[in-house]
A protein has these predicted regions:
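Conserved beta strand-loop-helix elements of the APE1-like EEP
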Residues: 25-40, 160, 172-193, 219
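Metal-dependent phosphoesterases centered on the DNase I-like endonuclease/exonuclease/phosphatase
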Residues: 10-15, 88-181
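Surface-exposed cleft-lining segments at the edges of enzyme active sites
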Residues: 45-47, 71-89, 125-129
Length: 223
């Protein structure tokens, strides 16, 4: 959504600060906080050409550097958008290398449009030659993690079929045909403070829900 229609006033009435980077009906990311929002950066801000799509926003909230991401979908392996997706992820890794320190408390949260491994899809056989599970995508995600990021949900839960996304079509939610593509990746100093992680399936059961379920993470305050 555009900045003009983002519900800033509604969040403010509930005691939240918010910042939003949107692009019409197609793309958008936001950060909403009760512990302050400082040092906001929209996009990569790396000195190169701006990203043509609104997919990344950074802010510091309560001493934690937070990024909200909406990683490109990729569409299909032979689509230009797939190459854009891989380049986008590599660009994010370069920003981490040049701007941030893996020792600092930092989290990159959002829709990654990648299932990290085969536990995170309902049937790997259904995804042969498909996006979201291709090896280049998973390698790009692993490169982000190799910088110093922990998948906090997967650290706590090892089993499969813990999905955050289900297609609207064909009753996929009720058939448990989903994927886990919404992630909280945190540096170790923050991941060590993780106290609870949850995918809220109940939010997916309502009338006219999103095709994604919220992924929640609780962290203790720094001592």
């Amino acid at each position: 959504m555009t900045e003009q229609v983002f519900p800033t006033a509604a969040f403010s009435a509930l005691g939240y600060e918010s910042v939003h980077h949107g692009q019409g009906q197609w793309n958008g990311v936001a950060i909403i906080s009760k512990v302050g929002i400082d040092d906001v950066v929209m996009g990569f801000a790396d000195g190169d050409e701006p990203d043509p799509e609104a997919r990344l926003i950074w802010a510091t909230c309560g001493g934690v550097r937070v990024a909200s991401v909406y990683v490109p979908n990729g569409r299909s392996l032979d689509d230009d958008h797939y190459q854009y997706k891989l380049a986008w992820l590599e660009r994010l890794r370069r920003v981490l290398d040049t701007t941030y320190d893996p020792a600092q408390p930092l989290a990159i949260c959002g829709d990654y449009n990648i299932a990290p491994d085969d536990r995170d899809v309902w049937d790997p056989a259904d995804f042969v030659d498909a996006t979201h599970v291709s090896q280049p995508e998973r390698d790009a995600l692993r490169r982000l993690q190799d910088w110093g990021l922990v998948d906090v949900f997967r650290r706590r839960y090892d089993e499969g079929e813990l999905f955050s996304w289900w297609d609207y079509r064909g009753g996929s939610f009720h058939k448990r045909k989903g994927m886990r593509i919404d992630l909280i990746l945190a540096t170790e100093s923050l991941a060590a403070r993780s106290t609870a992680d949850l995918i809220d399936r109940n939010a997916r059961k309502g009338k006219l829900p999103s095709d994604h379920a919220p992924v929640l993470g609780d962290f203790s305050e720094a001592t």
